[in-house]
């Protein structure tokens, strides 16, 4: 006799279908449509310092950044744009506030896109026609970047504060102005420091337009706090199929933003996994220094670009099981470590040789994977409990 527990025959898909949107091209990177979700960041240098800015862009590129934004608050910054746009390895977006003249300077400089903030550009609405014409002739998109911290005073007066409704109304109003001039190469962001408000705003926006959406939690905070806020907000939206490009905002070096963004996408299965270090959090059962082992293995394999899962475990309770599930792993205890490859113990080594052995085996497996044509991913680090 069977009992119907009301359970589905098969588990539901964890992610909703991707929201259908228009597609725009930011340089050679497609955003929206069926394009993969891209990861962006923003330089922290003075843009006018061309060498420093290009150096940071190179570091971001190496970290996996696909699109970079640079601030243009002054004439000196605007004058630096042609060289930066030409020499950057990835598409450059000019970030414009206050002065509409810098929008035209950025377009003339060859930037791949321009972000405008309708909340603080002087007489922005009056300039939309000219901006649309210039962007259309250059073949570049415009990001309408609405931010809770610089919302139009009229909307603040209407709603009392930067609500989700206020953010969406601002974005759609500006879109309508561009649409009046036949311009539709638009992507939108509606950023707020509160993930709950931000999630509500993007959900509303997704229901009311088909433009690609740039996800971001503004002023997210220091690295730990900002990572949590962004992971919560992005995870909720991306799981619903909302979002076409992301930027994690952290009070930290920009390359850290990129690493977090990539990790979020990998965690949702939205990007091919790269190197994944799985390590136990350590407890009273641990017979080795798991933290040191995991950090040394991570450092030794930094930059490895194949989807390889390495488990670093500190005891005999979960260690053997986790190590068997990984491509490569170690279960440590009693001054030694059992090295697993594809679930099988291949050797037992002294504790002093664990790191060296894992790195050697990882590099060997990586070479085999490359020879077999396994696609590259992006490096990531995961500490599992």
UniProtKB/Swiss-Prot annotation:
Look up the record and name the cofactor or cofactors this protein needs: [4Fe-4S] cluster
User: Does the entry feature the keyword Flavoprotein, yes or no?
Assistant: no
| Listed pathway(s) | Isoprenoid biosynthesis; isopentenyl diphosphate biosynthesis via DXP pathway; isopentenyl diphosphate from 1-deoxy-D-xylulose 5-phosphate: step 5/6
Task: Read off the SUPFAM superfamilies from this record.
Answer: Dihydropteroate synthetase-like (SSF51717), Nitrite and sulphite reductase 4Fe-4S domain-like (SSF56014)
Q: Which BP terms from GO are recorded?
A: isopentenyl diphosphate biosynthetic process, methylerythritol 4-phosphate pathway; terpenoid biosynthetic process
InterPro entries hit by this protein: Dihydropteroate_synth-like_sf, IspG_bac, IspG_bac-typ, NO2/SO3_Rdtase_4Fe4S_sf
Keywords carried by this UniProt record? 4Fe-4S, Iron, Iron-sulfur, Isoprene biosynthesis, Metal-binding, Oxidoreductase
EC category name: oxidoreductase
GO molecular-function annotation terms? 4 iron, 4 sulfur cluster binding; 4-hydroxy-3-methylbut-2-en-1-yl diphosphate synthase activity (ferredoxin); 4-hydroxy-3-methylbut-2-enyl-diphosphate synthase activity (flavodoxin); iron ion binding
Cofactor binding notes: Binds 1 [4Fe-4S] cluster.
Annotated catalysed reactions: (2E)-4-hydroxy-3-methylbut-2-enyl diphosphate + oxidized [flavodoxin] + H2O + 2 H(+) = 2-C-methyl-D-erythritol 2,4-cyclic diphosphate + reduced [flavodoxin]
Task: Describe its function.
Answer: Converts 2C-methyl-D-erythritol 2,4-cyclodiphosphate (ME-2,4cPP) into 1-hydroxy-2-methyl-2-(E)-butenyl 4-diphosphate.
The UniProt similarity line reads:
Belongs to the IspG family.
* Record protein name field: 4-hydroxy-3-methylbut-2-en-1-yl diphosphate synthase (flavodoxin)
Q: Which organism is it from?
A: Thermobifida fusca (strain YX)
